[in-house]
């Protein structure tokens, strides 16, 4: 066991005070200083302040501009919805509880916060997987005469919600459970204990394999094949400056997408697996809190990578924010026209995140 276990909680083992109090009833300032809880609350406020506008704006701009309502963009809207789930279901709750220094909302609140935060995170995770598959299918054309349409896009959305629910619902019905984690003011899946009757061992293995390793393999495979296809298309044309520039742009986008995926999920999954496989080892409350920051901050950098990097989305956002006029339209239009001719086969429009 990695700490002091109580009814539906587990206080981390590294606790120099020797005090153990229920995180549902008492402030946990004996674990870390009140300043750390204030910093956590401020960080959550920052995520809300930035994450809500950029994700809400994504939905609003798509509704306002008909040209954005294409099947390939459906998954990006799904990603924005997932981020809003995390903002309202996770960040607001954590900000409120961190101001009190413990999970003041009780056991029911812990279940709700853990569920919505996990659901939003998993929808986001599987949206990135579906996004990679869609780009691979559209660019690499592994299926001849296949035309990606609205029905395929809707199937992709349904798939993300099914996979997310298959991860977020089981802890509510007895396969594992949601408990306060890290600094004890936010809730997540129980990686810490092997509590009798909850089958935590099998659920953690299931989560690690089906909701981390498999998505990771799929993302690497799809983007790896996509890069190969882009390089082959570039090699088949004359090695002109425009072709090389388009190839570099696509490569840069793919690398950023993969790095964003790893930054989001690798720290959290690695630490959770370490805690689970090293029962009895000592770790402090910050050991699990800090990796969770990376996963939570995806609500900001996912839109930046997958939406703001896309010229069409970016131009429409600027037009909306500037009351119907884009002051940068001429510059971007000129640069787009200059690079369209010879680089059409490696055009980033099929690869970029929209």
UniProtKB/Swiss-Prot annotation:
Disulfide bonds join 110-187. Glycans are attached at residues 2, 15. Phosphorylated on some or all of the serine and threonine residues present in the C-terminal region. Contains one covalently linked retinal chromophore. Keywords: Cell projection, Chromophore, Disulfide bond, G-protein coupled receptor, Glycoprotein, Lipoprotein, Membrane, Palmitate, Phosphoprotein, Photoreceptor protein, Receptor, Retinal protein, Sensory transduction, Transducer, Transmembrane, Transmembrane helix, Vision. CDD domains: 7tmA_MWS_opsin (cd15080). Residues 332-354 are annotated as: Disordered. GO terms for biological process: absorption of visible light; cellular response to light stimulus; G protein-coupled opsin signaling pathway; G protein-coupled receptor signaling pathway; phototransduction; visual perception. The modification N6-(retinylidene)lysine is found at residue 296. Residues 334-354 have a biased composition (Low complexity). The chain crosses the membrane at residues 37-61, 74-96, 111-133, 153-173, 203-224, 253-274, 287-308. Residues 1-36, 97-110, 174-202, 275-286 are extracellular. A motif ('Ionic lock' involved in activated form stabilization) lies at residues 134-136. It is found in: Membrane; Cell projection, Cilium, Photoreceptor outer segment. It comes from the Eukaryota. A lipid is attached at residues 322-323 (S-palmitoyl cysteine). Residues 62-73, 134-152, 225-252, 309-354 are cytoplasmic. It is a multi-pass membrane protein. Belongs to the G-protein coupled receptor 1 family. Opsin subfamily. This is Rhodopsin. It comes from Oryzias latipes.
